[in-house]
Amino acid sequence: VYGCGVLLLLSSMFRQALLIRRLRRHSTQERIGRIVLVRPTAQIASFSFFRTIYISRSVAEKDIAAIFAHEKSHVIHRHSLERIVMESLKALLWWNPFAWLAARALTEVEEFEADRDVLAEGHDTGNYLKTIFTQQFGYSPDVADSLSNSLTNSLTKKRIQMMTTPMKSRYALLRLIAMLPIVTGLLAAF
């Protein structure tokens, strides 16, 4: 049973890598410095994989700069490598709920870090929030009647909260670093 779980998750990772490769092969590509921008005709959520950024041609021109900055942050911080390591650990520890929680927490931290970098580049917070909303839900928040139902318990809601509330403590990063040994110990215990 354990081996089947590991094999299933690792084969899923391999399948995703093949899909990314096929998407890149069937899309237009442009080199921007050390980064390759891939513009597929398929309507996909924007993402990066190592030094390659994928942004659908259906994305509005006004949103491309902020999305590119966000994905460039993922490239600079090597989040693809972190993700592969975490997904591999999750495959090996698939039965451990803490592995799944750690993977979700890593995703949140990576998104918060990328959002921080986008805002540090000088992108307008309000416009960037609209871009995130449009990317996540496929329509502009100007058209939405209520955000509360759509955003309940979502990563998008947490990202919006992180960008719109001031930092509560200088020591937030220190607290996060202090949590690493605890999380590592919990993962090792199971």
Feature names for model-found ranges:
Residues 1-190:
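Hydrophobic topogenic segments
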